């Protein structure tokens, strides 16, 4: 009997059995390692959150002033020329939606060019911008033009958002106008939910990216409709002039970009 117990003990020891004291020490060491990893992750998150490449200080809304010169409007065709994105924005090279061979950027560019032509005819200076904006881009108003996509063909409607961190203090006023004028021009449904991705749009993020707007550029982003929705495609693909008109009317109505009456 004693021989049997001894043999079992030897087998357990040879197989790597450890007593309760050793096991507890290993568990404590594991927990300490996990805490260190968690602390490292928290430190990385704090550094990322507080990172600021803008050569500050960041202006306040009270310090806002319009750019010198004629009223300039920047219209960004979302995802257009995204393959040219620099390393800091390399993820742009691989996103964007499509519908049966029509890429999102094609719809965005068509709307941007139509709106730009109408605005230039009214006397505005207009820049049609690709996915990557010039560093520190300055304009009276910047509008990023995009289209949504969904696995559900029932998803329909448009969204407008202003930056979560708006140094101008004026972007949400412009966003409200665009929600109204775009809906009136297109007949599409306004979706009141603004996604975090829209509010934290990379072109707004001058703290993190070199290729971002100047903090004093009033900025908006519009998802003009769902390219995956037959209802919305009647506007954004089949009648982009209606989408363009909705954008133009907002520019005209916004007090900062309204042309003086002749």
Identify the function of each model-found stretch.
Residues 2-262:
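Catalytic-site microenvironment of enzymes
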């Amino acid at each position: 009997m004693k021989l049997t117990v001894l043999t079992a003990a030897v087998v357990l020891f040879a197989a790597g059995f450890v007593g309760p004291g050793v096991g507890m020490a290993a568990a404590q060491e594991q927990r300490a390692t996990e805490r260190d990893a968690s602390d490292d992750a928290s430190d990385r998150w704090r550094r990322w959150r507080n990172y600021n490449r803008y050569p500050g200080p960041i202006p306040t809304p009270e310090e806002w002033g319009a750019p010198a010169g004629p009223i300039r409007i920047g219209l960004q065709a979302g995802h257009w020329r995204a393959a040219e994105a620099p390393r800091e924005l390399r993820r742009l090279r691989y996103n964007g939606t499509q519908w049966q061979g029509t890429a999102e950027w094609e719809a965005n560019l068509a709307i941007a060019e139509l709106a730009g032509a109408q605005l230039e005819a009214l006397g505005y200076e207009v820049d049609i911008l690709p996915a990557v904006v010039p560093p520190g881009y300055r304009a009276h108003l910047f509008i990023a033009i995009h289209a949504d996509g969904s696995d559900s063909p029932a998803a329909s409607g448009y969204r407008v958002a202003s930056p979560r961190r708006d140094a101008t203090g004026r972007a949400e006023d412009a966003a409200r106008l665009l929600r109204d004028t775009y809906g009136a021009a297109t007949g599409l449904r306004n979706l009141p939910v603004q996604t975090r991705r829209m509010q934290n749009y990379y072109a707004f993020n001058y703290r993190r990216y070199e290729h971002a707007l100047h903090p004093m550029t009033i900025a908006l982003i519009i998802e003009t409709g769902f390219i995956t929705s037959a209802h919305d495609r009647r506007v954004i693909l089949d009648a982009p002039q209606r989408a363009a008109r909705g954008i133009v009317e907002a520019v005209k109505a916004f007090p900062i970009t309204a042309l003086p009456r002749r």
